[in-house]
Each structure stands twice: as structure tokens, then as C-alpha cells.
Amino acid sequence: MDPGFDTLDEAVRATFPVQSTRIVAVSEHGDAAVALFDTRPGAEPYLYEVHYYRANSRWSEGSSSNGSGWHGLSPESDLGVETSWGDAPPDADMVRAERDGRVFEAPAALGAYFLVWWEVLDARADVKAFRVKGEWVRAPATWQEMLAQQDAWRRARGS
């Protein structure tokens, strides 16, 4: 049985060893939260998402994933939290995304972006652009992201 933690910060910091992981961002909403980690900060980034919940005044780790997406908050509701995250271009300080026809902007930092929508139905957000040195630059298409990821894997394997 997980005894939980007094604070969300304690729960987040206990998820991975601090010497080998970097906390990129945390978003809290009532008794739920989600954090984005870089689990390989000294090399090619490896982002990882972890959900947290508070029950009986104690924070505990919930599900986790190496991909963004929608996560239900309660079996009694169709609403949940949607995340969209990934690598940001060098020098990017903002990200622009579109969800349900609406445009959203959020900070990009530490080479990553992290967008969070709470109390939403399952839908997909699309990243459209990054602000780099004051100028908005179109985000790569999904196929371009996949090619970049394949290149990163090849470099990591030395092939």
C-alpha cells in the first residue's frame, strides 16, 4: 500500500532519482496533477509523463506514459486531462497549439513544451508553431517528427 506524500512536490520528486532525471513541468488541478520528466537529461532527451492523485489528503503516483494524450480523471465522468508535449526547437520560448478549433499558447522551456487541458472530453491537440527568438516558426509535421525521432534513435545506437 502506497502511503502517499504530504505534498505534490514530494510525490513528484520521489518518482525518479533526482541525480538522473529533470522535472520539466508540473500541472495541478484540484486532486489531480501531471508532471513531465526528462529521464535522460545528459543525452538525447527522453520525456516521460506521470499522473498523480490526492486521496485522504495524501498525494500518490498514478499511471504514466512515454507519450502524451488523454487520461480519465474518474470512472464516473467522461471528462479528463489531455496533454501534448515533445521536444521544442533550440531557443524556442513558446509553443502554439490548436484544440477543438481554438488556439492556445504556452511556454516552452528546457528544450521541451508541455500543454495541459483539464476537464475536457477526449480529443487531440495539434501543435502548430514555436516562437524562436521572437518569431513564430511552423511546427514540423507528424512525419517530420517521426523521421527526426528515427534519426535520434540511430545516433543513440551509433548506427
Language-model-detected regions and their locations in the chain:
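Long, contiguous interaction/targeting segments characteristic
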Residues: 1-72
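A broad structural signal for short, well-ordered beta-strand segments within beta-sheet-rich domains
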Residues: 20-23, 61, 92-94, 122-124
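Surface beta-strand/loop "capping" patches
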Residues: 67-90
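Ser/Thr-rich low-complexity repeats and stalk/linker segments
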Residues: 53-56, 78-83, 93-159
